[in-house]
């Protein structure tokens, strides 16, 4: 084996370990792992570092979270039984659409949508209509507004839809200038 091949093999092994290590904390967020495991993944996983500008000693920053093909800046605050995450990116219509698609890929479903001050409560609608009717009404509601209109979409894991205390709450906010993804893991 040539020296170049050996170096390439070692480098690719190191790179793949780094890449998978960066994803471990996000996979832990989505899993049923206890909050302590998530806190440990953030504080010792290597991707996050202590924020220098925060007053709190339990605030961590992430300069570049590759959420599928999107680049997000993140902050995390850790409390006793909760982890708060906030991710930001500049608003672009395609970025908003991709975030929605990626949240769905990760097993999350919309629970409530507010656009330009008007609200559609999916949980409530499901009590009075079939899932197909709710899907149709939701699409009509969303398409009523321009994509850059201020919006907030509440998400939960599909298996926790309708439960009073889900272990994961996600809120996708957009004001036409920035997109914020807030995640609370209990």
Predicted segments with their positions:
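Low-complexity, intrinsically disordered Gly/Pro/Thr-rich segments
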Residues: 156-171
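Mixed-charge, low-complexity intrinsically disordered segments
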Residues: 114-158
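Bacterial N-terminal signal peptides
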Residues: 5-14
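Intrinsically disordered, low-complexity boundary segments flanking structured domains
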Residues: 11, 140-143, 168
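Short helix/turn-capping signatures at newly exposed starts of structured segments
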Residues: 17-129, 173-186
């Amino acid at each position: 084996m040539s020296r170049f091949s050996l170096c390439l093999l070692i480098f690719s092994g190191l790179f793949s370990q780094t890449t998978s290590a960066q994803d471990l904390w996000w996979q832990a967020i989505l899993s049923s792992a206890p909050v302590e495991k998530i806190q440990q993944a953030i504080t010792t996983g290597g991707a996050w570092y202590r924020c220098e500008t925060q007053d709190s000693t339990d605030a961590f920053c992430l300069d570049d979270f590759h959420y599928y093909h999107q680049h997000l800046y993140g902050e995390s605050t850790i409390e006793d039984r909760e982890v708060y995450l906030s991710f930001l990116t500049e608003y672009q219509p395609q970025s908003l659409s991709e975030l929605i698609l990626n949240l769905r890929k990760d097993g999350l479903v919309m629970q409530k949508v507010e656009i330009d001050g008007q609200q559609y409560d999916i949980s409530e609608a499901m009590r009075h209509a079939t899932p197909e009717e709710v899907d149709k009404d939701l699409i009509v509601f969303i398409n009523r507004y321009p994509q850059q209109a201020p919006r907030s979409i509440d998400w939960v894991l599909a298996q926790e839809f309708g439960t009073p205390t889900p272990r994961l709450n996600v809120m996708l906010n957009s004001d036409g200038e920035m997109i914020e993804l807030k995640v609370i893991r209990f």
